[in-house]
Amino acid sequence: VVNKVDNFEKLMPDVYEFYNLGIGDPIPISAVGKLGIGEMLDEIVKHFPEDTQEDGEDDRPKIAIVGKPNVGKSSIINKMVGEQRVIVSDIAGTTRDAIDTPVVYNGREYVFIDTAGLRRKSKIKEELERYSIIRTVAAVERADVVILVIDATEGVTEQDAKIAGIAHERGKGMIIAVNKWDAIEKNDKTIYEHTQKIKDTLSFMPYAELLFVSAKTGQRLNKIYDMIDMVIESQTMRIPTGVLNEILTEAVAMQQPPSDKGKRLRIYYMTQVAVKPPTFVMFVNDKELTHFSYTRYIENKIREAFGFRGTALRFINRERKEKE
């Protein structure tokens, strides 16, 4: 267990150094930030004797429904489940706590986590409101796939972007459900224009899947399950090292890596080291020569080959001397 990983995105390269110990996969956590604790416990539980597990391992996909208050998160679950399991009213924040709702669809069971939504800091006056924010983050932590519900009549707000950022930093599968689509006047360009606005605002997660829905009419809600299945498949996909390096060789041949002061970046090979999200380590001659634009180019080539729709991809650069 590697503690003090307070920023997963920045510190993961350091975590992977612990592979050199040869005693298994390092588990990153932050005791202070309460990050990664669930994953650590999951690993511990895997080693419990089988006869002590009465219910077995819970492999049901966990879906966090998140968004700012009163965008229709609970209404979406109610429509999908077919009953009022979560009390809803038009007053923002009537869902006070995270509630797990199991749903069976086409023979597969899903667990939906509904939350009270994130509040603007200026409106937080009680500890209860602060607690609901913590629960939103906790729901994202527990989830395999995050469904961010936004209001079609408002577009992506600053708060929506903040919630999306939380899910992105934690490498969760991402679906954006644009609710209240029935309230929008439409022409043949409406979906395209809304899609472009959303992608421009959330440019840090171009991989996110979009779905235009209406909790009021039920429009397209039945497509959510297929989209969830697709995103989970992307999150757990493993690519053989040999296949990855065929793509890498072709990509390098088409566009040379960057150089600086006469020294060119060399990528010796790459391998996938993790899922949820899919994480790749690239062994290079000099990390200082790597550039995010070239990493994005490699990422795009991998996505062209395998899709990886709805999930972030992580890339770690590690130096390796040529003689090695």
PLM regions with names:
Residues 5-9, 32-36, 92-94, 117-119, ...:
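Conserved nucleotide-binding/hydrolysis micro-motifs of P-loop NTPases
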Residues 126-153, 162-177:
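Inter-motif core of Ras-like GTPase G domains
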Residues 86, 118-132, 182-190, 236-237, ...:
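Flexible beta-alpha connector loops of hexameric P-loop NTPases
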Residues 64, 227-232, 236-290, 296:
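Long, well-ordered amphipathic alpha-helical subdomains in the mid-to-C-terminal portions
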Residues 17-20, 43-145:
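Conserved G1/Walker A P-loop phosphate-binding module
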Residues 307-322:
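A short amphipathic beta-strand at an alpha->beta junction
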Residues 5-62, 173-175, 182-242, 312-314:
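Canonical P-loop GTPase G-domain recognition
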Residues 198, 294-308:
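Short, non-transmembrane amphipathic alpha-helical segments
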